[in-house]
Amino acid sequence: MIEETLLEAEEKMDKAVEVAKEDFASIRTGRANPGLYNRVLVDYYGSPTPLQQLASFAIPDARTILITPFDKTALRDIERALSDSEVGANPSNDGNVIRITIPELTKERRKEYVKIVKTKGEDAKVSIRNIRRKAKEALDRLVKDGEAGEDEGTRAEKELDGLTKAHVDGIDELLKRKEAELLEV
């Protein structure tokens, strides 16, 4: 039971780190990055469809993204979804591909994005700590109910603390990299 509890906690912590990575990727840095559009949904034949399923991405230079739809009839729908997205893109359509030029970020905008990244990072850390708290409660219950010994419970708690620290450190590392990326001119 202890191993299952630890394994479940680790899986949930890994998921929290993955969500943080996706959140960080969706924040633009003034550099072309297809990850900006991971959450864009296109109304394709009446059904919201992720952009990655409808088109391929190419990055010809540091500030341009070319989006080539697999189905040319979806070009207008994709362009509309990009215009409506929170990314702040101005797509131009030449009939075959959609070209997006990423504008340079102002100093104020960069600082704003750093604050957003820090908030998302802190949310991820809180999520990891909540997972730790729930796992610790489950471990304490196992010891209390006599399903595990005191020594096993203490060892498992130390292992849980190690997992928590490793995942929080992982978030901190992601945070540092994204901050450096944002502040780089």
Curated annotation (Swiss-Prot):
Any single biological process term in GO: translational termination
UniProt entry keywords in alphabetical sequence: Cytoplasm, Protein biosynthesis
GO CC entries: cytoplasm
Main location as per UniProt: cytoplasm
Cross-referenced SUPFAM superfamilies: Ribosome recycling factor, RRF (SSF55194)
Gene3D superfamilies tied to this protein: 3.30.1360.40, Ribosome-recycling factor
GO molecular function: ribosomal large subunit binding
Protein's cellular compartments: Cytoplasm
Similarity comment text for this entry: Belongs to the RRF family.
Record's function text: Responsible for the release of ribosomes from messenger RNA at the termination of protein biosynthesis. May increase the efficiency of translation by recycling ribosomes from one round of translation to another.
Protein name, as recorded: Ribosome-recycling factor
